[in-house]
């Protein structure tokens, strides 16, 4: 088993899905959290000058959160059993990441007028993405389990990670999508994920 170090800011953000994968796989890693005040000195040392970064065996450093999460999901067995499964996982994760990115744009915007426009975009993205996800989940055993097959996969965990802050801000976000809401509850109740959530750093994002 290689050694892993995950570099990110002291928050959940784009790295939380990676941390959840380490937790559910029971794989040890170094969780290196960089404070914003330290970022300037670290920035030029990081590939693409961005976070998160996954370092493998102190030799290979790779950026891009979704590339990292997909790599870890493949390595740990949470990416499906065949190419069609993986295709579906990618589709669901990309849809959630689009929603997550739109929410982050709202979260980070300081200008009130721009924030209002970005909020409309986020709401439109929700109206496109969430019905599709609800229908996709329901197609697998009525939506009572996971998105694909009988095992929790990357896309299930992504449903929890990507929607955490949006739901904290709007508790009714999934009111019209009861299957998705129940899925998030199942993910959070997974013994290894529940243990991780209980002990993780308490951060705003």
Curated annotation (Swiss-Prot):
Q: Which UniProt keywords apply?
A: Eye lens protein
GO terms of molecular function: glutathione transferase activity; structural constituent of eye lens
Q: Pfam families of this UniProt entry?
A: GST_C_3, GST_N
Where do the GST N-terminal domain residues begin and end? 2-80
According to its UniProt entry, the protein's GO biological process terms are: glutathione metabolic process
UniProt note on tissues of expression: Lens.
Domain (GST C-terminal) ranges: 82-205
Functional description taken from the UniProt entry: S-crystallins are structural components of squids and octopi eye lens. Contains relatively little if any GST activity.
What family is this?
Answer: Belongs to the GST superfamily.
User: What's the name of the protein?
Assistant: S-crystallin SL11
Whose protein is this, by species? Answer: Nototodarus sloanii
């Amino acid at each position: 088993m290689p050694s892993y170090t995950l570099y990110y800011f002291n928050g959940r953000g784009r790295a939380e899905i990676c941390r959840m994968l380490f937790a559910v796989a029971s794989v040890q890693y170094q969780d290196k959290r960089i404070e914003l005040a330290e970022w300037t000195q670290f920035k030029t040392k990081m590939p693409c000058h961005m976070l998160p970064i996954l370092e493998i065996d102190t030799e290979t450093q790779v950026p891009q959160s979704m590339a990292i999460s997909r790599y870890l999901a493949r390595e740990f067995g949470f990416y499906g059993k065949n190419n069609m499964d993986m295709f579906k996982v990618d589709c669901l994760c990309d849809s959630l990441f689009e929603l997550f990115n739109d929410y982050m744009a709202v979260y980070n915007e300081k200008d009130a007028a721009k924030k209002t426009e970005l909020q409309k975009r986020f709401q439109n993205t929700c109206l496109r993405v969430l019905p599709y996800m609800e229908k996709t989940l329901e197609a697998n055993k009525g939506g009572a389990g996971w998105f694909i097959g009988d095992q929790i996969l990357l896309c299930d965990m992504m449903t929890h990670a990507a929607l955490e802050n949006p739901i904290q801000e709007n508790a009714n976000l999934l009111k019209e999508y009861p299957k998705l809401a129940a899925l998030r509850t199942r993910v959070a109740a997974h013994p290894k994920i529940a243990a991780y959530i209980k002990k993780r750093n308490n951060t705003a994002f």
